[in-house]
Regions:
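Hydrophobic pocket/interface hotspot
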Residues: 11, 68, 109
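A conserved amphipathic terminal alpha-helix motif
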Residues: 122-143
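Hydrophobic/basic alpha-helical segments enriched in Actinobacteria
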Residues: 68, 104-106, 141
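Beta-strand/loop substructures that line and gate deep hydrophobic ligand-binding cavities in soluble
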Residues: 83-125
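Hydrophobic-ligand binding "helix-grip"
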Residues: 55-101
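Short C-terminal domain-edge/linker segments immediately following a structured domain
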Residues: 27-30, 43, 99, 138-143
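Flexible internal linker/loop segments at domain or repeat junctions
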Residues: 44-59
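Hydrophobic ligand-binding cavity/cleft-lining segments
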Residues: 1-48
Length: 143
């Protein structure tokens, strides 16, 4: 379940640390394929330093496949930009989190993708349906 008292970044890290092996296998396949098109190898979703304290994360740091853009107790913005698209992920917490310590924890994940060109549109054809399976599988760690 979502952990009371844990910041939005903490909730995100908890979820990605429990990334299923099949999701990481999909990321490895994705990274091999996109290199043929000159796109970035993002690594794995759970590529994190397990010893790094939560308070040591700063904007600009890599957090798995994303760059930390903004970090507030109740919301974290993560993103990545490549020549084909830009993505921003928001993890927002209410109730029981660091900003509001009473009540059940509700974690809301929102993703915005800006496609830059035909390559981005082509890329999203297989990626969008896969994300409908991957996102719930990763978020199961939060309950």
């Amino acid at each position: 379940a979502a952990e009371p008292g844990l910041s939005a970044l903490g909730q995100f890290l908890k979820a990605v640390r429990a990334t299923p092996a099949w999701v990481e296998a999909c990321m490895r396949l994705r990274n091999r394929v996109v290199r043929w098109f000159g796109l970035k190898d993002l690594g794995g979703l759970s590529d994190l330093d397990p010893q790094r304290p939560l308070q040591d994360y700063r904007p600009g740091d890599r957090v798995g496949i994303f760059t930390l853009l903004e970090n507030h107790p109740d919301e974290v913005l993560l993103g990545d930009r490549d020549r084909h698209l830009e993505v921003v992920l928001s993890v927002h917490t209410t109730g029981g989190g660091a900003a509001m310590p009473t009540g059940p924890v509700v974690v809301t994940i929102t993703t915005v993708v800006h496609v830059h060109n035909w390559l981005g549109r082509l890329y999203m054809l297989p990626v969008a349906p896969m994300h409908r399976r991957i996102a719930p599988a990763v978020l199961r760690a939060l309950g």
